[in-house]
Amino acid sequence: MRALSALAITLVLAAVAAPALAQGPPDPAARIARQQAAMKALSWMDGVWRGPAVTTRAGGQKITVTQTERSGPLLGGAVHVVEGRGYNPDGSTGFNALGIISYDPDKDAYSMRSYAMGQAGDFPLTLTPTGAVWTIPAGPATIRYTITARDGVWHEVGERVMDGQPPMAFFEMTLKRIGDSDWPSAGAIPPN
């Protein structure tokens, strides 16, 4: 009798699960279309940018570099890739970072995967009427980068924010758009 009950339960579970197993994976086209539509809000970033950037270190020492950014869509416009380089006065690279910005339709939220100075992380990015804000948790503080884009100028300010204290600016760059770029989508390897 027990064996018959176990068999009956197995058959019922198999019958219930069969329709779900028969379905294939969901068609990604609608999801990708939502990602592509959301990423159009960042199309102002596309191209090549250059200008001064100043970082203020602890103790007030200022480091000035020539900052460049190149930015563009990838995966058919479903993600946005940004590379930043800071050049020292002697022309050497003093800073290099890579960011991949994506949109999650399930969460209706943007995020940026950032790689810089041997570190990596996923950070929330929020669009604003004039650009974007992205934040990095840093112990009791939050590092907040506020980007303003207007008339071919990319202005970004980095601040250290702690509860009960005014934000402390430690980074500022003002870049001008100097041209178009087919990076990163150009140069794909052909099939033969």
Model-assigned labels for residue ranges:
Residues 9-10, 20:
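Cleavable N-terminal signal peptides
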Residues 1-8:
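Bacterial N-terminal signal peptides that target proteins for export
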Residues 22-192:
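Hydrophobic small-molecule pocket/channel-lining residues, especially in calycin-type beta-barrels
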